[in-house]
């Protein structure tokens, strides 16, 4: 048995999830009545995610902000602006795509009983009350807006704390991230249960819905990578951006696609930055920082899946609320780094903007894990390749202003 478990653990998570999906579909189509107990694995998996997600976000944000260092004399300010602007535009693009190609998900009947906010005033009022929520109450009730607010405030307050205090917080953050990793390792079994339950409850049409959702997600990410990002680069360097874009995707994006980790791709990006002849004092800061906060792919995932839930529940969304979602998704995406399935775990934060309960939001997270084999890989490829892309863009824009020749090798 130990040898069997060891062999199973040596198989990549992507392959294990694919196996889980195949088993779930097979059981649901062939012997649904005698294997109904399979669906409990999906419920347990979602329950574990619901339990760990609030604490994860809380400590992760505190640790990141408390350790932020300011005052370095580098080209970092321009890069940070590019990171933030591109992430917001990616989120806005995802919102537009979701309205042009609305996707409906297969949720349980209890998920239909939602009281959505009636207008933008009610949304803002709810948002403000969630911000000032008691931190303990926010953690217990998965009020992610309140959690995010308290985490940011505590992180800022702890920036002047001794290193020992920051190390303790960082260790807590690492420990919770490890727990999340353990939970994610059960994803194949959990997803098997979720797929089984979805097909038994809704039929094979549920898989078609997932296909539509994946098409909107990947289509939006491709648009961001091959249209929006090159446009941002062109406006900064005033020359053909595609040689730089293609090189970043080829030498950074492809690796990130298979590792599915921005953090693991940092050495690749540092080497590529050196090959591009960039300033080491800049890229040694911007690349690790980008792996933390430059999350255009995560912003797309959060926006698309949140609006898929909104369309499913037939909640009316006005222009003001859509813009707030774009900003909120961009901010939330910055907290998705370094965590397996991080962007999916931040979907409840965006869903809370529309009054969608946490249990329904976690069903959407479950759907995200079902399509996560491709979604997470493409998301990471977009995130990580953009780190080098915008670091190089800022460097080349500075050289152009100084009258220096900028030669980009494809």
UniProtKB/Swiss-Prot annotation:
It is a multi-pass membrane protein. The chain crosses the membrane at residues 11-31, 45-65, 79-99, 138-158, 179-199, 214-234, 285-305, 327-347, 353-373. GO terms for molecular function: neutral L-amino acid:sodium symporter activity. GO terms for cellular component: plasma membrane. It catalyses: L-serine(in) + Na(+)(in) = L-serine(out) + Na(+)(out); L-threonine(in) + Na(+)(in) = L-threonine(out) + Na(+)(out). It is found in: Cell membrane. GO terms for biological process: serine transport; threonine transport. Keywords: Amino-acid transport, Cell membrane, Membrane, Symport, Transmembrane, Transmembrane helix, Transport. SUPFAM superfamilies: Proton glutamate symport protein (SSF118215). It holds the Pfam family SDF. Belongs to the dicarboxylate/amino acid:cation symporter (DAACS) (TC 2.A.23) family. Involved in the import of serine and threonine into the cell, with the concomitant import of sodium (symport system). This is Serine/threonine transporter SstT. It comes from Geobacillus thermodenitrificans (strain NG80-2).
